[in-house]
């Protein structure tokens, strides 16, 4: 009897998890489209430093995760950043559906979440110098977690890189917010082994650089 009851509970939990996973999966694409619309509406109001358009492509929805590309197009370029009109920054995005994203479960985290995502910078004409500086490794990778209540957390991993006379080791930054509007944003981070080489005999070094800040918007 106990064994049958336990089996019934397991089956019920599996059904609930499966239903929750399916439902949260249906919310990903509408959420992406709303984020893009809000961003582009802000552009029309002149709230961005550069004339940029956000879009997405190749959306592929599965049961446990959704994959797509997010791209930022500099419509008129950014001369001060040596960015030509039409050049793009592209990100590969892999979203694991809640309420219990697989990766979080594998790390022993059983707190329900709307979604968890991995974001990687794509190597293209505009971003290639960053990959070269990082010795052909991904220069930055982000892991994001979105809670049902609106709070979010992001971990940004930075690869060691060398940009001419300036170099640094690996780094990691975390961003935690109360809601999607970025209010009360808690930022912590650290970059190792910073070097600024003025000449073969003259350089400035720092073992690490640390940030610990609470931003209220």
Regions found by a protein language model. Name each.
Residues 1-13:
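N-terminal Sec-pathway targeting helices
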Residues 7-8, 18-217:
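Glycine-rich, small/hydroxylated-residue low-complexity segments
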